[in-house]
Amino acid sequence: MTHTRTRNPLLLAALLGLAACQPQPAAEAQAPQLALSPWGASAKVKAEDLRQLPGSAMRLAASERNGLLLLDGEGRELARLPGSFSSLDLRSAGPKGLIAASLDNATQQATLVSLDTDTHRWGTPLQLPARDYAVAGLCLYRDDARNLYLFLVGEDGHGEQWLVGAGERLNAEARHVRGLALPPAAEYCQVDDAANRLFVNEENVGLWAYPAHPEADSARVPVDLVAPFGGLAKSAGAMAVVPGGLLALDPAAARLHLYQQQGEAWNAVASLPLPGLEEPERIAVVASAQGTDLLVQDDASGRLYQGRLDWQAQPVALPPVLPSVAALRQSEPVGRQGDAADDPAIWVNPNDPAASRVLGTNKKQGLLVYGLDGQLLQELPVGRLNNVDVRPGFALGGQRVDLAVASNRDTNSLSLFAIDRATGEVKPAGEVRTPLKEIYGICLFQPASGELYAFANGKDGRFLQYRLDGASGEASGQLVREFRVESQPEGCVADDQRQRLFIGEEDVGVWALDARAEAPAELHSVMQVGETLHADVEGLGLYQSDARDYLVISSQGNDSYVVLDAEPPFALRGAFRVGLNAAAGIDGASETDGLDVTSANLGGPWNQGMLVVQDGRKRMPEQTQNFKFVPWAEVARTLGLH
C-alpha cells in the first residue's frame, strides 16, 4: 500500500495548481443564501454530533452525558440508548429502520446499533474490538452489493475499514478488512456510497478523497487545500456529502464551503460565513427538492443551528453498477510480498476430476500447485515465472504426460513442467530459450493433428511461436512464426478447435488471428478498450462447452471481467466483478493479472466448471496476493449465459 503524506507546500502547489486553476467561489452577492437559527433550544438539546433522518423530521444525536438519542423535530426525546457517545453516522435499514454507528467514550470502542424508528426500539449493539490507537472519528459506507462497512479515523494517521453488516442487518461480529494510511491530523470522514468515495479531512492542510471500496487502490486526490494553496481560509473540518457535491466546514474561520464534483476534481462553488457561530464543528445535511437542509453544531456554545441552503449540487454520471459473483474458495497467499502472484492454469485430472489442480505463477519465486480447496500442495522455486498454460497428452521420451509451460523472466525462456496424469505431481521438464529481452506472456495451442505450440510474447510487442517436441526425452522448441503488436501485450489464449488465437494488447484491446504456424498473422479486432473494457487488458481465458463458447477477459482498469462470445462477431454477453463472500470470509478480487477457466465437471460446486482469477489486493485479512476460485455456474446465472 502506497501513501504519500504531502508536507512540502511547494509540492502541494505543484501537484494541485489550486490557487491558479481551481475556479474560485462565487462572489458573496451571488452566493447561495443560508440563514441559520437555533434548534432544540427549548428542549435544551446538547449533543456532540447530530444526524437528520432522511424523509423525516426526526434526528439522531450522540451525547457524552445522555447516550444515543432519537429526537423529534423540536428536539424532544423519543428513545434513548444510555451511555456516553461521540461521533455519529447512520444508514437506512428498511423503510422504518436505521443503523447507527458511534464511538463509546467509556470503552473507546466503535459501536453499531439498529433502531426501529416506528417502535423506537433499539437492537443489540455490535462493538468493534478496542483499538491500540485513539479513535477520533468514524463513518459508514454501503457498497453496490449492499455490504455495510465502517471506517475508523485515528490519531497519527491510523485508519481502518471493517465489515459490519449486509443488507439491512448488522453482522454477528465485525471483521477487519484493511488498514488505511490517513493524514495524521485527520478527525472526520464521510462516504459517498453511490460514488464509492471516502472523504477525510487534514485539519491544517485540506480535504482529501479516497476510493472507499475495499478492493480499490489507496490513492488519494485533493478536494481543496488551506490557503494559500486552496480556498480554505484557515482549516479543514467536518464534511457532509450530497449527490454530486460536498459541504465542508472551516471551523477556525467559521465558514461553510460548497463543492461541485467535475470529473475527477471538485470545483469550489461558494464560501459562506456562519454569523453567530464561533467554532462550527459538526454538520449534517439532507437534500430536498427545495434545497439542502442543514444542522450545524457550534462547539464554542454547544448549541445546534438549523437552516435551509438554496443550493443543490448537480448529480454526476456514475459508472454502471456491475453484478457481483462471489468466490467460493481461495488459495493460500503466496510466499512473497508485493506484486507476486500473476497467472493461474487449471489442470483437469483425467481420472478423478475432483483431484484436479490449479497451477499459479509467483513472479518472485516460481510455480505453485494448489488443490481445489486452495491448499498449497507443491512449490517449485524455478525463478520468476509470469504466465502459465496447460495442455494434455505431450510425448516426453517414452512417457505421455500433461504439460505446463510458463514464461520465465529470469532466463527469458519457456519453463516446461511434466504433470503426472495419475497423481497430479508436477516436475520440471526443461527449458526453451528465446531471444526475447523481456518475456511476458505465454499460451499453448494444440490442433487436432496433435502438435503442441507455445506462443511467447515480450514487452516490446513481439510474439514468437514455437513447436514443442519431447520425443528425445528432453523438451525442445523450434521457432516457426513471428509477429508483433504495436505496444505491450501479455495475456493470450488459443481456441484449439477453431485454430484461433486471442491476444491482449494492454492499452488497446483484444485481437484474434489464425493460430496455425503457416498462416499469415493478420490481426482482427475483437474488442477495444473503452466503456466496457478498461486498460490494462490482462488475462484471457476460454470457456468451451457443448452449448456455447465464451471468451473471458480481465479488465484490470475497473477490477472487472468481461465475457464475449468466442466466435465472430464476438458479441458482448456482460461484465461482472468477483465480490465479497462474507459468509466464507473471502474478500473479492481486484487488479487481476491472469485468469483461467474450464467447463470440465470438477464435482460439487464446480459441476459446470471453474473460473480462477488472480487477486492483486488481498483483504480480510490483508495478506500477500492469492487466487480466487469461482463456480462458473454463478457466472452463468449472473449473466444469463447458456
Q: Can you describe what each PLM-predicted range is?
A:
Residues 22-642:
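Sequence/structural signature of beta-propeller domains
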Residues 2-10:
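Bacterial N-terminal signal peptides that target proteins for export
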Residues 17-20:
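C-terminal motif of bacterial Sec signal peptides marking the signal peptidase cleavage site
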Residues 13:
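…; additionally, a secondary subgroup of soluble metalloenzymes is captured
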